[in-house]
Amino acid sequence: MAPTTDAVVNLWPGRAPGTVAAEHASHAMAAEIPVLKPFLLPAGGPPRPLVVVLPGGGYSGRAAHEADPVALWLNGLGLHAAVCHYRVFPWRHPAPLEDAQRAVRLARSRAAAWNADPGRIGILGFSAGGHLACSVANFGDDGIDGDDVARLPSRVNALIACYPVVSF
């Protein structure tokens, strides 16, 4: 049962809130497009839980060893996974939180196509990603104004916080 990496999905239609076109960016990372990279188990059987993975990196980058390898490990446990490439420096709060909440909503919006259970969406994060995962769990909502994805809940059904930054 080998997992497949589905096409990377932009979190936002067009540019993320508050971003500018690459030619107007004052920092290379300012023009980066936040994405969700799904790691899906083969179709068949009942819908499975899905875990959104938030790599750490001090909000200045994203640690590669806390991204794709973790998603593949989750696949080995029988879970779908999706790695969220959220905005980091020069972006500050609330940009990473907006991206992580959007990733949860987007996973819910694609649940049928991904054979995922929209009622069993979890989030896992390391270090700064753990802080972000805790924030998503704490500030989850039932949907906000906006497009069809925005109107879906950002509440998670499970939280896994791996050495989260919870005190400064």
Show which residues each predicted segment covers.
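N-terminal cap/lid segment of alpha/beta-hydrolase-fold proteins
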Residues: 1-45, 49, 93
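Hydrophobic/aromatic beta-strand patches that form the interior of the parallel beta-sheet core
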Residues: 9, 52, 82, 160-162
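N-terminal carbohydrate-binding/catalytic regions of secreted carbohydrate-active enzymes
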Residues: 35-40, 60-66
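Short beta-strand element of the alpha/beta-hydrolase
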Residues: 47-57
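A fold-wide structural signal in alpha/beta-hydrolase
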Residues: 50, 75-85
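Active-site loop/turn elements of alpha/beta-hydrolase fold enzymes
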Residues: 56, 79, 86-88, 164
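Catalytic nucleophile-loop/oxyanion-hole region of alpha/beta-hydrolase
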Residues: 62-64, 69-70, 84-118
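Primarily recognizes the serine-hydrolase "nucleophile elbow" in alpha/beta-hydrolase
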Residues: 102-168
